[in-house]
Amino acid sequence: MKAYINRTATFAWSPATYESDSPLIATGTVAGALDESFSNESLLELWKPFYAASADANIDADAKPLASISTSARFNRLAWGYANPSRPKGLLAAGLENGELGIWDADKVLAAAAESDAQVIKNTTHTGPVRGLDFNPLQPNLLSSGAVAGEIFIWDLNSPAKPYSPGARSSKLDEITSLAWNCQVPHVLATSSSSGYTVVWDLRGKREVVALQYGGGAGTAVGSLGINAGSALAAGGRRGMSAVAWHPDTPTRLVTASEDDSSPVIMLWDLRNSRAPEKIMTGHDKGILSLSWCKQDADLLLSCGKDNRSICWNPQTCDIVGELPSSSNWSFEVQWSPRNPGMLATASFDGKIGVHSLQSTNAPEPDAPATQQLNEDSDFFNQATAPQTTSKGLSLKQPPKWLRRPVSAVFGFGGQLVSSGGPSSKPFTPTVHLRDFVSEPSIVERATKLQHALDGQSLAEFCAQRSQDPSTRPDDIANWKALQTLFRADSRDELVALLGFSKEDIAQKVSQSIAAFKTNGTAAVEPEVTPVTNPIDEPELTKPVTSADDGADAVEAANEIVEPAAIATEPAPEVEANDIDEPGLFGDDAAGAANNDASDFFNQISAGQTPAVRSALPSHLLSESQPHIHSSAATIGSPAPSSVASESIRPSTFKIYPSEESEADKLITRALVLGEFESAVSLCINSDRFADAFLLAVRGGEELLAKTQKAYFEKRTAQLPYLRLFQSIVSDDLTDVVQNADLGEWQEIFVVLCTFSKQDEFSNLTEQLGQRLEFQYSLARNSDITQAKEHRKNAVLCYLAAGKLEKVAGMWIDEMKEEELALRSNTKNADESHKGTLYSARAEALQTFMEKITVFQSAVGYVDVDLQQPTQDSIVAETGARSYKLAPLYDRIHEYVELLADQGLISPALRFANQTPADYRPHGPADQSATATALKQRLLKAEIARPKTDTAASSSTNNVVAAASASASSYAAAPASNGYAPYDPYGQSTSSSVPTVPSVPAVPAVNTYQDPYAAAAPSPSVAAPQPPTQSRYAPAVPAPVPTAMQPEPVQTNAYGAYGAQSYQSAYQPAQPMIPAAPAFGASSYGQQQHQQQLPPPPPLKRDQSGWNDVPEGLAAPKRTPSAMSQHKSANAITSPFPNAPAQAPSPYGGAPGAPPTGPPRGATPSRGMMSPPPQGPPSGPGLAQQRVGPPGVRPPPMGPAQGQPRPGQQQPGPPSQAAPSAGPYARPPAGPGAPSANGMQQQQQPGAPPVGPGAGALRPPGQALPGAPGLAGPPGVPQRSATPGGGAGAPSRSATPGARGASQMKYPPGDRSHIPENQRPIQHALQREVARLKATAPPAQKRMIDDTERRINLLLDHLNCGTIDAKTVGGLMQIVAAIEARNKQAALNIHLQLVTSSSGDVAAGLVGVKMIISRL
């Protein structure tokens, strides 16, 4: 209750046109009731309710009315209306109990005028109490009144002297209880009577239109039947109608209320079908006394009655939408406020008029207890009758129309905008619209371009575009150029060029410098040496050579004797060869002579003279035309003249020990003569003659050269700075350059690393350089912003070259913040209303950041090891306590995922979400710290619920994860460390159903299939190429399960990735000392030509797994294999001699240990070449095979016949010496725990080729798929026929059902571009889980994982071709969601539902899915 008036009175609200800050209420003392004062006085009062914040019982006890006038009689009805310029506050009309109609001027009443002055009309036309009174809402000057005996008068207040009658008095009316004007048609009036009728009048026609009556179960329109009110039918159905009200919007609808306590109903009538009420509302316990229909909202109807209740209804639905607190006595009147529909008032006989608000905020108080402890002196009757007031307000179940939004909208996850709206006539049946909402189209465009670049592997071009984009910040241009260089093979050279360094430029500058030296004569020339004039005495030449020790002493003595001035201490300058004067090579002229001047030759040429050309080489080596002059030097002491033509003895001949030679030179010469290079080098070094030292050290060996270099660097590094750098380069100690070189020359340091560092050292060295630059950045960021940014840019370049994502991410985050601030600043300067663009600035900066991160990951192939090492501790995973080195990057990825999702890019968002650990919890507010798993689940749900659309935004995100995982390596394989649990075989029987097989394909098969159960294999680089898809009937993973539960899928070929043939086993046994099953890969040589000539095989019947299995007593005992012995136990017996060495591979492809392969193409095996029976009963699985194995089938003349064994069959006995080749389609060995196959499971079919008697040979291989690798398996051992001649009539197996599925595929295997966008989560989740299995599975189970991968690829092939039904796709989506959530049980339940209704390739693929689920 908002307010109340202490009066037992009828009331009326001031009209809507009344101008006041708050509405007024007029009250008139009600007739037939007494108040607390027991006064007989009748008052007309005007009130302004005090709207208190609380409804305490005494808050309005002393409230006084604004005006009060005494009247001659009490009031039955009070109405307030007809406000006009002459009477702005309107007129107050009252129906009194004495039959008088009184009308007062409200303005005069408020002015406290005398009663005679305030009353406008006082009419006594009515003969009885006036209980009906209403102003016409469309013509306010008309006032209707009703009294006893069906009296109805219409008053024109402009001339109220004489009233008008609506027509002839109706016989169906007695006392008029209520009347109401139609809200849409001004001349229609409805009147209700105590007789039980409600009559509708047409005042224009002055006639009764219709009379409505409620007869107990339905209303009755009796006006047209001429039934009188006093008739039996009418008398039996009389129930007084206490109130009537018109629909505020529809002129043909109205409601009536019954005051009968036995049938307190409200009837909704439609005059177009007036024979029965349209609806009946029940809820009151006793008769209803008043109705009020809200003019502003037709869905709100008030009623009150004898049960002390005031109820708010929705007449459209007949529901109670609210109820006021009950009064302690009858509530006899209720009205909506005309001006403020949120206010309403009720009057009751408990002496209060309550004013209520629909927006009351008062908290409800607890109800008083039913019984209270009474004091001894208390008055029982006073307490029993005390009014109980509560503060409980009216609370509606539905919003009123003026508060109801005509259109509502809300943003949904995934860029969805949900809006609802509808016509005002049907507010509760609105139309719901679901729209894609893109608030940042530039982000969508850029994200789409990024995805296109990833899909098209054109990220280098993407970098070039970003670096040339005018919108790119200058700081980012260097980043994009550096990123572009990382995609090139010679990225180091590109980085060097990016910094402005060029070898060509250096070479050009050196050439220019040399030319300048020549022109200016500034090149230093070695001092001329005085020529030898006196020969050395002969005794000097004949001196005995000292020993090594003596020579060392002599060297030391020379070091002491030689004066420093006599030894060149300055380094010899580098000069051109043309500038060096060597007089000993140009005749006997002394050095420095006039004709020996270095420029004399050129001077003679310029003077036109032609001097005699003399060569630096001896003339006897130039020409034989000169006269033979024998060299005296060559012939002295010779028994015969020398045969070598020589010039005569010239002064150019030299002495080994010239006289003017220093003692140090003599010692060097002596050491050289003896080959003592180390001593000579030592003397040269001590004499600072490093050029001579290096020449001698080169002849002395690498060790001496290294010592010479070290000594040279020690002495000369301080004088020549470039030697410090060269020393680091020569000694492979670039760490010294990185750590000690001045950072002002960081570019030179970086170029040195790019030029000289080793591949395995480059990353660490550039990281160290980046760390030095980053440290300078951290120091300068608070003082010199410009210098700090320069250091950061340089550090980013170093980290990019080093491939350190964790380093560069932090610095790019700083750049992102700066870019965001810059965008905000630009926005503020451009437009003051920038509040809505803060999100855009953040989005733009974040998009740039993620573009750089994505491109960088793809360029360097970054591997995030945290993704490969999931958290093992469940508590740590739940709390998010694990620390990650890329945590800041993960936070930005989560933010970017939400940004993409907000723009409707669900698939790209899901791909980026997968680049964070599953248990990572972003840092931020609690409501935004959902783990990566929760975010993925939400994205998956949005992806599943999203309709299939081929929009540009969605099509551009087809292969985000595929590209990102291949390049960014978020899911790249990491070294495995965990064990591998035995495979749960649940769900393997799903592939037992086999469809009909088509005819033989015309395209030749290619045998590249790998045996998933073969022994350990070499690296994939040695093996045959992996096929992109797998056989849907590839061998199931073995497990220790009962025989009846084992599937019998038929193997077939998968598509070959390449067209090459496999001529030998793709995998060789890892341990030849152990009898191992030969791997798949038997020769396909000799098949490609004749396969096309074979007739179509007969159709294959469906096999029902387990219906005719071998009894468990005959089967070999099964054991659960261990991780170490699993590959051993799966090997079949391939030789009767266990200790025999493995055979070499057959030239036709037979695996080691396999029987001789079949003849080459064109050769026909002899009919007599049948396998002999085994020498002894084999043990183990072979025994069961021999007992129940199928009869052998002899191969046809043109190579292997059609057929395919089941993967669950064990290998039979030892091979024959002339058995046909196992071929690429022989069945694989049975795994540990696999059931013994029953030979009778294969149904007999007519049309088999004839066979000879005796033991049967291997089952012939089946037809290969076009371009598919064959199922190269180990050769089978011949089986003993169960009956003589049992091989006769055995049918050849037709081509596998996989051939039919493959031939019908619209797109080639491995293609994933046609997978619908809403099904992309299936592809990426399965590929990601397969990558996880490959990374974590031990090597012993590699073939099992490969088999799972082939099954998944086959399933994805069908998904790409659109051959999987919608129900299965939906189930796969649910499985993917469960896998992402790591909900193993839910995934198993969904998988069970799928496998029970799937067959063919889908069933085979689901086996791979089951493998993934089992490893969660």
Curated annotation (Swiss-Prot):
The taxonomy runs:
Eukaryota, Fungi, Dikarya, Basidiomycota, Ustilaginomycotina
Question: Which SMART domains would you find in this protein's record?
Answer: WD40
User: From start to end residue, where is composition biased (Pro residues)?
Assistant: 1171-1180
Chain intervals with Polar residues compositional bias: 1122-1137
Q: Where is the composition biased (Low complexity)?
A: 1015-1024, 1140-1149, 1160-1170, 1200-1211, 1233-1246, 1256-1271, 1290-1299
Pfam families documented for this protein: WD40
In residue numbers, the region (Disordered) covers 1015-1040, 1078-1317
- A single GO BP annotation from the record? endoplasmic reticulum organization
One GO cellular component term noted in the UniProt record for this chain: COPII vesicle coat
One MF term in the entry's GO annotations: structural molecule activity
Similarity comment: family membership: Belongs to the WD repeat SEC31 family.
Intrachain S-S bonds = none
| WD repeat ranges, renumbered to this chain | 8-48, 70-114, 125-165, 171-211, 236-279, 283-323, 326-366, 410-435
Report which superkingdom the organism of origin falls in. Answer: Eukaryota
**Protein name per UniProt:** Protein transport protein SEC31
